[in-house]
Design a protein with these regions (language model features):
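Beta-strand-rich N-terminal accessory domains
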Residues: 1-88, 93-96
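Short, solvent-exposed loop/edge-beta patches enriched in aromatic
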Residues: 43-58, 70-91, 121-122, 131-136, ...
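A generic secondary-structure signal for well-formed alpha-helical elements
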Residues: 51, 55-56, 167-173, 181-189, ...
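Active-site core of glycosidic bond-cleaving carbohydrate-active enzymes
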Residues: 433-463, 519-522, 540, 544, ...
Length: 801
């Protein structure tokens, strides 16, 4: 007989005490930006299926059920509770949240004491270990079926809560575990169906989002007893069979057997004192066994609860699984623009399939758990990676589910669906290309088919045009939305039509940016080269856009010297930082992009596409002509770059500003050249000198290396201008990219020191599971839930090279 044991929590998991309070958490830099405070835990849910977050305090407080939109608010009635009574002893009972509701509701409940146990997280698994209160040893492991290479289960809107209970005493203990849930069907859709876009105080565009929070009219709860499964299903009266956004179901369930007693109450008032379920549960761990499917009246709230009671003998261990699932199959963008979610490819699209997902979860959760372990253990057990990096590698993947993530149902054009992660909640547009230059390394290595799908969407967007005029937030100028041939900054926003209407951001005129076209070419070649070098059709899909956008970018080479010039207004990823003339950053990316285009073209000449529709008549002649032209541009640019910008210690910011700032990411193009096995942009001796200068000036000289690498400071670590914004920020994802570059150039020890500093900034200061773009030297942050921080997987790649 298989012996049941308590789970072994990996030592690498991030941990804090249950109910941790933060004395001085970092706070947001701009008041208009999002700052939900530090009480964030690991999300649960599938990629693109919506997710929920359960904090280290034990409450469910993050709700990303409506694709692309963010709600942070605790629902106290969504909660576990535990009753324990040793034989001949006193009973004790607690709701497993350390924070009582602020509105005074559920006043009959007893709330778990702060500090009695620990919370651990190693995405996609997390654990609550309860200590010092109960006589039994009690651990709840939480996870969703997300693991590398899973293009099916990783999309499931399912959360598993596996309870492990061990009796270390010499007497039997009666235990009861209760799960309560509030019916929120219908809440998660925007009540404001408007395309109005406003400009915030930081110049970035924002649209209004107001969920139908608390609108439970017509909601009803049902007890489901299905063979050995028992649970509560949360539904809503709706008109017609076709679900709209926000329509669907929630459910939770557990398994039962003769050793377990099941109790239920399917309709209680979560805004009252909670006595309907608490009094019985606190008395003996039971519930009144009350069923009521009456739909909720206007202003009424309803919740349901199930309790499982059992006796555990001395020295024995028991496991009790609870499965929570939701089925909201439709994501609506602009009014009438609807997409089905990826999981509907496996469970249907009518919004009535939540119980099928519950059954799947109860049947397969052990297998899912093992799949996650098999994926994680080679990294956790390897001596190649420091322990703090193992923790951060997995926990930064929280954004795969919590990044406002979209993953649509498959189509003939997109056989694994379309995919997108927001730049962040404050900058609410998808897959910003400059950001994903580093931020896409996780998707590349873990879900390469999705990474290619994103780049194919950019390829389709490049030849499009949108002449709609807009006001630019940075300077008030007017500009068109999207120029034909320009690589778009992003793939659009949740309030319009992602993938179809690109270039949502209007803080700068991104048609003028000098890095985006190069970024596109580099990522196309990278995605081919680092995923097996056998998907020539992917290159064929993107080739025409490679050619078109390089021609577009060359149009900014006003003196025809071989390198496009920056125009003075911020026109690259550091979009509050003026570059003028030839710049080290954009010039290096341009040279490496041309090298990549030459490689792509030669691959296509040698490899006709599998899909004949991808190759036009005369394609070979057109490719050959493009290669001749690109080679000419490349040779002229190469001759110029080093001699124009090198100052003996590092590459100058640009040729037009006269600045002596050391730009930390100045050799991003050289990093990509080394990554892709391309000819160097600059010789290795200059690379090493530059990296040593960056390490000294931007890290050690910037507040003694306390925060990480600053984007741009003078050689002594001081500011060029005291009121600079981007230059004086430490960007998490940029730091991770630079560290990967350092590792490739023999500075592993220094690089890992930098990365550990940044990781500690995140996880020691209340920024866990909301990693920001930027940290400042005055303990503030900007742009939480940021995509670029997934660039920590570039460090993983560099350590494996």
């Amino acid at each position: 007989m298989l012996k049941i044991e308590l789970p072994q929590i990996p030592s690498q998991a991030w941990q804090c005490e249950i109910g941790k309070t933060w004395d001085n958490p970092y706070t947001v830099r701009y008041s208009s930006n999002l700052d939900d405070g530090p009480n964030h835990g690991m999300p649960l849910g599938g990629m693109g299926a919506g997710c929920i977050g359960r904090s280290p305090s034990g409450d469910f407080n993050l709700w990303h059920i409506d694709g692309g939109n963010h709600t942070f608010q605790s629902l106290p009635a969504c909660q576990f509770a535990v009753f324990e009574q040793p034989e001949g002893g006193e009973a004790q009972v607690y709701a497993l949240n350390t924070n009582a509701p602020e509105d005074g509701s559920l006043s009959r409940w007893s709330w778990y004491p702060q500090g009695k146990g620990s919370y651990h997280a190693l995405y996609p698994r997390s654990w609550f270990q309860y200590e010092g209160i109960f006589q039994s040893q009690l651990i709840c492991e939480q996870f969703s079926p997300v693991w590398a290479g899973s293009y099916q289960e990783s999309s499931y809107p399912v959360a598993v809560f596996e309870w492990s209970i061990h009796n270390p005493t010499d007497k039997p203990i009666t235990m009861s575990i209760l799960l309560s849930w509030q019916n929120s069907v219908g809440w998660f859709t925007n009540a404001i169906k408007s395309l109005d876009v406003k400009v915030r105080d930081d110049g970035s565009p924002v649209y209004e989002y107001q969920p139908r929070w608390g609108d439970s009219t017509g909601n009803l709860n049902q007890l489901i007893q299905d063979s050995f499964r028992v649970g509560c299903l949360f539904d809503r009266i709706r008109m017609g069979d076709e679900p709209k956004e926000g329509e669907g179901q929630w459910a939770f369930a557990t398994t039962t057997n003769p050793t377990l007693e099941v109790f239920y109450h399917t309709r209680w008032n979560p805004k009252g004192d909670g006595s309907e379920i608490w009094d019985r549960f606190a008395y003996n761990g039971s519930l009144p066994d009350y069923q009521d499917e009456t739909p909720a009246e206007p202003t009424e709230q309803i919740a349901g609860a199930i309790a499982i009671r059992f006796t555990i003998r001395p020295g024995k261990t028991k496991k009790i699984p609870f499965i929570l699932s939701w089925d909201f199959p439709v994501t609506e963008f602009a009014q009438g623009i609807n997409y089905f979610r990826r999981y509907t490819d496996f469970f249907g699209r009518n919004g009535r399939n939540v119980w099928a997902m519950i059954r799947t979860g109860l049947k397969h959760h052990d297998m899912w758990q093992n799949k996650i372990k098999l994926w994680q253990e080679p990294i956790l057990n390897s001596s190649r990676y420091p322990e703090w990096l193992k923790m951060a590698l997995f926990n930064e993947l929280y954004l795969l589910t919590q990044g406002g993530t979209l993953w649509t149902a498959a189509t003939e054009t997109d056989p694994v669906g379309q995919f997108g992660i927001l730049e962040c909640i404050d900058y609410r547009w998808y897959e910003s290309l400059d950001v994903r230059l580093y931020g896409s390394f996780a998707l590349l290595q873990l879900f390469p088919r999705l990474e290619k799908a994103v780049m194919e969407a950019f390829s389709r967007a490049i030849p499009t045009a949108d002449d709609t005029p807009r006001v630019i937030g940075y300077n008030g100028a007017s500009a068109i939305r999207k120029a034909k041939g320009a690589t778009p900054h992003d793939l659009g926003a949740p309030n319009e039509h992602p993938w179809v209407k690109s270039n949502y951001t209007s803080y700068q005129d991104c048609n003028l940016w000098k890095d985006l076209g190069s970024d596109f070419v580099l990522l196309v070649y990278r995605n081919y080269l680092l995923t097996g070098k056998n998907d020539q059709d992917f290159l064929w899909e993107c080739w025409d856009s490679v050619v078109e956008t390089l021609h577009y970018l060359k149009g900014f080479d006003l003196d025809n010297d071989g390198i496009p010039e920056n125009g003075g207004a911020p026109d690259q990823t550091f979009d509050d930082w003026r570059l003028q003339g030839i710049s080290a950053y954009c010039g290096g990316l341009w040279i490496t992009a041309l090298e990549s285009a030459l490689r792509i073209g030669n691959i296509l000449l040698a490899n006709p596409p599998v899909n004949p529709n991808l190759e036009r008549e005369n394609a070979q002649e057109e490719i050959t002509a493009s290669l001749v032209l690109f080679e000419d541009w490349l040779q002229r640019g190469r001759a110029l770059y080093h001699d124009t910008l090198w100052n003996g210690q590092y590459y100058r910011l640009d040729t037009g500003s006269g600045s002596d700032v050391v730009m930390a990411d100045q050799l991003s193009g050289q990093y990509y050249a080394q990554l892709l096995g391309l000819p160097d942009v600059v010789e290795s001796q200059y690379v090493k000198t530059t990296l040593q200068t960056i390490y000294q000036s931007c890290y050690l000289n910037f507040h003694g290396g306390k925060f990480g690498i600053a984007n741009g400071v003078k050689p002594d670590g001081s500011a060029e201008k005291e009121n600079d914004t981007h230059p004086l920020e430490v960007w998490t994802g940029i730091n991770f990219g630079i560290v990967a570059f350092m590792i490739l150039n023999g500075m592993k020890e220094e690089g890992l020191q930098v990365a550990e500093t940044v990781v500690n900034q995140i996880y020691d200061n209340g920024l866990q599971f909301r990693t920001p773009e930027a940290i400042t030297a005055v303990n503030t942050f900007r742009a939480s839930h940021y995509l670029r921080a997934l660039g920590i997987w570039a460090i993983y790649h560099a350590l494996n090279k």
